[in-house]
């Protein structure tokens, strides 16, 4: 059954039956990720004239945050390299490291070092942020899409639960300001983005999956003319924090709350102080400048230079049109035809 035809009372079952990855699927994707991580750490930069060491590989995206949708087998792997010693280095040199990773992948394929097939895709831009490829193997029932992103290890040995040194953000803000590239280095803070969502209640992650599924359904009509999916994930967290904060809640009410927030996109101004705050004058000034921007403003909790909600009001208008239509579907209604009702928000919008 499609989501739009699913009664509100059955949304939890819909998530369980259609959106939660099963154990076999999760194991397969994990195996694929392990293959690529091993390649990056053990093989990729061996034998190069100028030794390059991989300091760590961090799993980002849905698989890192624990919000993967069933059937969508993709993984973001951020590769932190010792040769990238600044934000400027990352911007200037990531292209050469992407080329080297690609060269080694193709060599592995020719030598059949791994029992996998790499179908390397051509980069679509001059200075790509990522190398995209598809990994397939007789052991895997389906292909897994990868984005591998070389990055500068700005955080170093960061301990979960602690705020990074504000000076890291001061350097980030200076670099972004001088280049006019806000949010350009968000990959450096993948661990924080992952940490922000990772330990949330299971049911909130299920609601995020539902919202992502709705977003993907809308994308079939509008293509890439919608706001970033990450903005919808953060909007869902905000809805839960402001409207519920319970580990057990009505999924239908949560879903309706997110749809209604999309309708109010012109009033949204959302930020968190989990990893940075107003204490440091440079960071505080950057945050205030961001919060004065035209709505919607949804600041990346890991990167004060990244307003993931901004940039294109038309994209939000398209999504709002969809939200208005979806509020009339059974997934938002009680048996008597009335709306299930959104959560009462602590912060009025």
UniProtKB/Swiss-Prot annotation:
Site (Interaction with dsRNA): 157
Compartments, record wording: Cytoplasm; Mitochondrion; Nucleus; Microsome
Primary subcellular site in the record, as a coarse category: cytoplasm
Positions of region (Interaction with dsRNA): 12-59, 199-209
Enzyme Commission identifier(s): 2.7.7.84
Keyword Acetylation among UniProt keywords: no
Keyword Nucleotide-binding in annotation: yes
One Pfam match: OAS1_C
Coiled coil: none
UniProt xrefs under InterPro entries: 2-5-oligoAdlate_synth_1_dom2/C, 2-5OAS_C_CS, 2-5OAS_N_CS, NT_2-5OAS_ClassI-CCAase, NT_sf, Polymerase_NTP_transf_dom
Keyword set, alphabetical order: Antiviral defense, ATP-binding, Cytoplasm, Endoplasmic reticulum, Immunity, Innate immunity, Magnesium, Metal-binding, Microsome, Mitochondrion, Nucleotide-binding, Nucleotidyltransferase, Nucleus, RNA-binding, Secreted, Transferase
A GO molecular-function annotation: 2'-5'-oligoadenylate synthetase activity
PROSITE patterns, per the entry: 25A_SYNTH_1, 25A_SYNTH_2, 25A_SYNTH_3
Names of the cofactor(s): Mg(2+)
SUPFAM superfamilies, alphabetized: Nucleotidyltransferase, PAP/OAS1 substrate-binding domain
Catalysed reaction, written as an equation: 3 ATP = 5'-triphosphoadenylyl-(2'->5')-adenylyl-(2'->5')-adenosine + 2 diphosphate
GO cellular component, one term: membrane
Activity regulation description: Produced as a latent enzyme which is activated by dsRNA generated during the course of viral infection. The dsRNA activator must be at least 15 nucleotides long, and no modification of the 2'-hydroxyl group is tolerated. ssRNA or dsDNA do not act as activators.
Sequence positions that bind ATP: 62, 209, 212, 229
Binding-site positions, Mg(2+): 74, 76, 147
Protein's recorded name: 2'-5'-oligoadenylate synthase 1
Source lineage: Eukaryota, Metazoa, Chordata, Craniata, Vertebrata
């Amino acid at each position: 059954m499609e989501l739009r035809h699913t009664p509100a009372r059955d949304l939890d079952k819909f998530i369980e039956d259609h959106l939660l990855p099963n154990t076999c699927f999760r194991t397969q994707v994990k195996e694929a990720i392990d293959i690529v991580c091993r390649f990056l750490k053990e093989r990729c930069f061996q034998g190069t004239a100028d030794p390059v060491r991989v300091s760590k590989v961090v799993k980002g995206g849905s698989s890192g945050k624990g919000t993967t949708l069933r059937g969508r087998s993709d993984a973001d792997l951020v590769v932190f390299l010792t040769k990238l010693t600044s934000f400027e280095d990352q911007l200037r040199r990531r292209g050469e490291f992407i080329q080297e990773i690609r060269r080694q992948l193709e060599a592995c394929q020719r030598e059949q070092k791994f029992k996998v097939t790499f179908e390397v895709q051509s980069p679509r831009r001059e200075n790509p942020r990522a190398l995209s490829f598809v990994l397939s193997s007789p052991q895997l029932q389906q292909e897994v899409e990868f984005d591998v992103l070389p990055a500068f290890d700005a955080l170093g040995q960061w301990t979960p639960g602690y705020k990074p040194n504000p000076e890291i953000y001061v350097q980030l803000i200076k670099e972004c300001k001088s280049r006019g590239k806000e949010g350009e280095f968000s990959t450096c803070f993948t661990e924080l983005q992952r940490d922000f969502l990772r330990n949330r209640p299971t049911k909130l992650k299920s609601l995020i999956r539902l919202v992502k599924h709705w977003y993907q359904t809308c994308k079939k009509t509008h293509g890439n003319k919608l706001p970033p999916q990450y903005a919808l994930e953060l909007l869902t967290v905000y809805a839960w924090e402001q409207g519920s904060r319970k580990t057990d809640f009505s999924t239908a009410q949560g879903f309706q709350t997110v749809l209604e927030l999309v309708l109010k996109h012109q009033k949204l101004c959302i930020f968190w102080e989990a990893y940075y705050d107003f204490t440091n004058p440079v960071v505080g000034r950057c945050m205030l400048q961001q919060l004065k921007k035209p709505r919607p403003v949804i600041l990346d909790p890991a990167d004060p230079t990244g307003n993931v909600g901004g940039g294109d009001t038309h994209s939000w208008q398209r999504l709002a049109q969809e939200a208005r239509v979806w509020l009339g579907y059974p997934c938002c209604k009680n048996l008597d035809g009335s709306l299930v009702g959104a959560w009462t928000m602590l912060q009025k919008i």
